Structure formats: C-alpha cells, structure tokens
C-alpha cells in the first residue's frame, strides 16, 4: 500500500512511474528510485509522516494568495489562472513600460482569466494584495526567416578550443573566432556555430569537457582575448601546441597571461578610464551571481586537491555563511581577479560577435547551451535550492547504449523554478543570448522531460521527470525576441511523440543530420525531402565526420573503445557500411553532386565534396558545415561514452582559423556552398 502511495505522489509531482524503451517494452520505476527523485524535489517520502507532508505540499490551492510568482501568457491570447472564481475580479496591470491599466479577471470554466494583452514583456499583475509577474511572450521564437525572409543561408560549425590563432597559448580563443568570422563572412557565410563557452574550473584544468560546465551563467576565461578588449596586442610566448591540446599546460600559460593583464589593468591608466568604468558597470550588473562565482573559483583554488565542494567543511558549503564572507574579505584582490576574468571573457565575446556582424553575417555567432551543469560546480554551490542535488541527467538504455548513459550533470528542479518565478532559467537564457545571434539548445527534450538517475545508481535505474514545457517555451520565445536571437533545438534521437511539432510551432529550428536522413526506398533522403524549417548539417561533434564514415575508421574507433553496443560484431557493422556506401553515393549521383563509380573507402575527397554540396541543396533556411568536414578530417571531436581513453575535445586546427578557408580543398567546398546558397 505504501508503494502505491509513493507512486501516486510521484505522478502528482510529474515523475513518470512507467516508461517505454527503444524497443517498445514497458518498464516500471522501482519505489526506491521514486523516493530518491521525490527527495530531490523537496518531497521526502521515506516515512508515513513524510508522505503525508509531501502530499499536502502538492495539494492544489485555488485562492489568489496561492498564485505562483510568475505566470506565462502568449500575446493576444487570454490566460487562465489556476485560481477559482465565479465572479469578475478587478485587477491592476502595470506594463513593463510603466503604463498602468485596470482590467477585470473574468470567470471561465471555474477559473479566472486574464484578458488578452498585446504587448510582450514582463508585466506586473496586482490582484487584491497579491502581485505577480505576468510574462507575455510572442507566439514563436525569432526564426531564421525573421532574419532573412525565404532564407537559404549557410555557415560553419567550429570547436572554439580547436581554433588556431597567432596570439593564443595553445587553446582556441575568441580572437580566433573573430578571425574565422571575418574570413567566412567575406565568403558569404551568415553564421558560425561554436562549441559551448560556459565556465569550467580555473583551478582544475583537467576538467575541460565543454558540456560539463561549472556554471552556464558565466564564461570560460581560457577563451578570452584581451586584445579584443584592450585594443592592443598582448605579448605572449608563441605556442608550440599542434595536433592535440595539452589542457593543463595551455591553461597554465593562459592564466599566467591573464594574471599579468589583470595586474597591468590595476596599475595602469585603464583602471581610471572608460574600461575601468565599464568593468565597474559589469560588476554591478552581474551582482551577487558574479560575486559568488568568483568566491567559488577562489575557494576551489584554495581547497585543491579537495576539489568537490560537497567535501569541503560544512561552513564553506554555505555560500552565504560567515566563513565564506570571511574568506572573501581576506582575499579581495583574488575575488576581483576572477570578476575581471569574467568581464574580459564577456567583452571578448561581444567583440567577436561584432566582428561577425561587421563581416556581413546576418546571424553571426551561434552559442551552445549545455543541458545541465556539474553538481560539483559553481552554480550548484551558490544556488543549491535551484537544482536537483543527488540526481544526474542521462538517458535510459537503448540499442547503442544497452546500459544507458549517465552524463554526470544535474539540472534545475521544476518545482523550484515554478516556486521561484523561473529566475535561474531566465538568467541562464539571458547569459546565453547576451552576445549571440543564435543559440543551440543541447538535448532540447530537456525542456519537456529529463531522464534522472539517483547518484550511485546505474543509468538504467532512473526515471523521467516532466518539466513545465509550455512555460519554458514561452519564456524562451520572449527572451529570443528581446535579444534578437534565433534558436536551434538539438532534437536528435528518441523524443516524446509530438515534440518535433511542438518545437516547430514555437519557432525553434530542429536539426537534420546526413547520417539520420534515411529512406527505405532510396537509402538516403534527397535534399528536397529535408523539410524547410530545420538546420541541415553533414555531422555533429558526437558523430563521424564524412571522411571517417566513408573510410569506416569510426567503426574501428568505436570497437576499440567498446562503443559499438553490447554483443555487436564489428564485422557485421562493417558489412552494413559496405552496403551503405553505394546508397549514399547513389543519392549524391541522383542530385548531380557526384558522378562516376562508387569511390573506394580511402577515396574520401570526392565524397566530402559531394556531401557538402548535397547539404547545400536542401531547402532548409540554414546549412551548417563543420570545419572537420570542410578540411576532410577523419577524426570526430568527441566519442560519446569515453573520457580520457579517446582524445575528446583536444584536436587543434592545423593552421590559423582564417587561413583554413584559403586552403585548396576548403576553398573549393565553400565555393560549392556559396554558389548553391548565395547571399541575397
């Protein structure tokens, strides 16, 4: 009986007590897993008393005093409040502009309804003695078609850390991104999609995976470019790094450089000039979030090698406690240094986006928003009530990953978001959009649901937790329009039924990748069948490059690292690839982007040329070509499921970013794309 009460509580909390796997088989989530997920939501369920208390917390109340702090609405449409009422209720609406209106909340099907409001923004609704934020969004995000009607744009995707720039110290930076944007814009490109730039760990350079951030509110100073901020060349020792990045060595060199720049800033004329004033404004604008991030960075450096904050003494685990305040007061210059790093990073990104737009790009830089954050990071420490401590994000078992996946990330608590007016979600969106022309939302399904795993459990022992997707999509649309940012949702793999349609209706562009565009009749879907609303690409950072796929080297690498799937014979996979090669080549020939007999596995140049032209011929509003494919490289940036055994996130471009586009093969491929998709 108690287990059934737990299941009922879980359902009411938005936890799916059953789920279907990739084969359609149903699974029931065990009560211990449900209890762990409930506990992370602030709904303990281990005893009868806890169950009763948690059930009371979920009991819906319908009085005005129980309204949440923020309610979303769509411009031009009335909005039902979760408040009962049979008579009209007078209210005062204060628009974001300051205009005040007197409105009536009218009853509709037993609930009060806010009349339609045309103006988008964060307005205030006052009813009796209760005031809430009414976030009125446009119906859709800003789309590529809003930027350029009937668009057929093209752009590049690049791993920021891998860009090569004469002034870097072995890790790609935003000066390299600016160089690439300037060169690509001159050739007709309208966008550059970059790998995540989120803050990692200044004191722990061994943790360099860009999708496992310490905080998504701040940036990784390793990508900062002081020359973009100070307008002068900063003397650095030339980097000898080629091929693979040595993150600890390069990080040490970069932070040594940034420390020198900081000290010169404090002692020089800039401190009392416009740049000093700009730094002061930035610190004021970012407020407590920046201060706490700087405290965390300084504390972690002092606590190393005890790097995980949950292992720190109890008084240091409280970001608002006396011990942390005492530490910060005793290290004022160190706190200021970490705030300076964020200011330089922020202004570097702003400058790089400005260069992209001045180069003629209609979109410019597209940032990447990771699905979650490291539970041992800055955000988790400073805003513990925001997140699902004790749970990690992953994926249930599937054909390629029969044991499931644990990404060692955590995310926002949907209950905490709703109770707190979605402040952390909005802050994350605003940080991602501040200096971007577009954002890519990694694992966009996380807007609707996440697979959550209790820490210490296997990935298969998880559960789906539903999120307030309608609210999140409205807030995403509002911030997108306010920032003039287009939104791309990574919607690959298995997603809930209707999710693709939901994204499309919200103006979010999905992703179409060559390897997944299959057709039972012809093998591969022709370009005209790729639709007209998504973003097309040859591959992604987690998938084989065109040359690697054609040669079959991706099969060898996955087999070497045990990533083919349990019990999968590599010879079977190789034979399937032998059958797929002519299917892909024939698709190219039918579209007149390839000709002649099927190339041999090691004849990759013609195949890469054809793939790039094939993607360019699609009718989607934006085609993105990874630099790895423009260069004809075999190696992919990341092999999912591996950490140190494969050189993930370490590959460098063989030459400066802007010079890459001038090489014969790259120039030829860009010519194909620019001819098919000329800038209008």
Regions found by a protein language model. Name each.
Residues 1-194, 230-237, 473, 481-486, ...:
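Carbohydrate-interacting/catalytic domains
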Residues 39-76, 92-111, 115-127, 133-382:
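Acidic/aromatic-lined carbohydrate-recognition and catalytic surfaces
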Residues 203-346, 372-622, 628-629, 644-645, ...:
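Alpha-amylase-like alpha-glycosidases and glucanotransferases acting on alpha-linked glucans and related
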């Amino acid at each position: 009986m108690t287990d059934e009460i737990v299941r009922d509580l879980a359902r009411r909390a938005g936890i799916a007590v059953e789920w279907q796997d990739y084969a359609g088989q149903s699974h029931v989530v065990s009560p211990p897993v449900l209890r762990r997920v409930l506990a992370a939501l602030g709904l303990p369920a281990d005893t009868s008393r806890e169950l009763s208390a948690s059930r009371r917390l979920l009991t819906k109340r319908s009085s005005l005093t129980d309204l949440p702090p923020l309610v979303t609405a769509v411009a031009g449409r009335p909005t039902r409040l979760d408040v009962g009422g049979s008579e009209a209720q007078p209210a005062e609406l204060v628009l974001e502009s300051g205009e005040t209106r007197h409105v009536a909340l009218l009853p509709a099907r037993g609930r009060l309804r806010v009349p339609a409001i045309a103006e988008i923004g964060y307005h205030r609704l006052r009813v009796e003695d209760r005031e809430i934020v009414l976030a009125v969004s446009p119906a859709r995000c800003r789309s590529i078609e809003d930027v350029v009607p009937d668009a057929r744009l093209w752009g590049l995707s690049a791993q920021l850390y891998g860009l090569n720039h004469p002034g870097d110290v072995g890790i790609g930076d935003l000066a390299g991104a600016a160089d690439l944007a300037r060169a690509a814009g001159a050739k007709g490109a309208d966008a550059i999609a970059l790998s995540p730039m989120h803050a990692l760990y200044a004191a722990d350079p061994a943790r360099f995976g860009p999708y496992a951030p310490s905080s998504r509110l701040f940036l990784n100073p390793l990508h900062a470019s002081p020359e973009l901020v100070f307008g002068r060349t900063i003397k650095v020792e030339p980097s000898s790094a080629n091929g693979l990045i040595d993150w600890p060595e390069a990080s040490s060199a970069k932070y040594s450089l940034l420390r020198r720049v900081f000290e010169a800033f404090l002692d020089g004329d800039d401190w009392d000039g416009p740049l000093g004033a700009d730094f002061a404004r930035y610190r004021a604008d970012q407020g407590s979030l920046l201060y706490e991030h700087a405290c965390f960075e300084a504390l972690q450096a002092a606590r190393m090698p005890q790097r995980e904050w949950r292992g720190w003494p109890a008084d240091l685990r409280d970001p608002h406690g006396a011990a942390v305040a005492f530490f910060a007061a005793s290290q004022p210059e160190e706190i200021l240094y970490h705030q300076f790093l964020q200011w330089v990073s922020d202004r570097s990104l702003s400058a790089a986006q400005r260069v992209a737009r001045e180069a003629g790009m209609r979109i410019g830089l597209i940032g990447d928003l990771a699905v979650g954050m490291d539970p041992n990071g800055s955000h988790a420490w400073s805003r513990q009530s925001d997140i699902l401590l004790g749970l990690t994000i992953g994926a249930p078992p599937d054909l390629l990953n029969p044991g499931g996946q644990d990404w060692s990330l955590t995310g926002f608590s949907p209950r905490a978001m709703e109770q707190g007016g979605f402040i952390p979600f909005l802050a994350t969106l605003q940080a991602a959009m501040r200096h971007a022309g577009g954002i890519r939302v990694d694992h966009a399904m996380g807007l609707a649901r996440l697979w959550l795993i209790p820490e210490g459990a296997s990935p298969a022992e998880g559960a789906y937790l539903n999120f307030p997707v309608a609210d999140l999509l409205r807030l995403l649309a509002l911030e997108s329009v306010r920032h003039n940012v287009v939104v791309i949702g990574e919607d690959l793999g298995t997603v809930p039924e209707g999710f693709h349609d939901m994204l499309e209706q919200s103006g979010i562009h999905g992703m179409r990748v060559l390897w997944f565009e299959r057709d039972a009749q012809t093998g591969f879907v022709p370009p005209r069948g790729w639709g007209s609303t998504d973003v097309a690409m040859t591959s992604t950072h987690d998938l084989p490059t065109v040359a690697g796929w054609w040669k079959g080297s991706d099969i060898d690498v996955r087999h070497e690292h045990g990533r083919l799937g349990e019990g999968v014979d590599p010879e079977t996979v190789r034979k399937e690839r032998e059958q797929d090669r002519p299917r892909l080549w024939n698709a190219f020939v039918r579209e007149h982007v390839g000709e002649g007999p099927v190339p041999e596995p090691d004849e990759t140049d013609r195949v890469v040329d054809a793939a790039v032209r094939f993607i360019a011929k699609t009718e989607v509003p934006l085609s993105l070509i990874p630099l790895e494919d423009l260069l004809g490289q075999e190696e992919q940036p990341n092999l999912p499921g591996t950490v140190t055994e494969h050189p993930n996130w370490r590959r460098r471009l063989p030459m400066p970013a802007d010079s890459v586009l001038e090489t014969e093969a790259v120039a030829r491929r860009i010519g194909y794309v620019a001819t098919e998709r000329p800038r209008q």
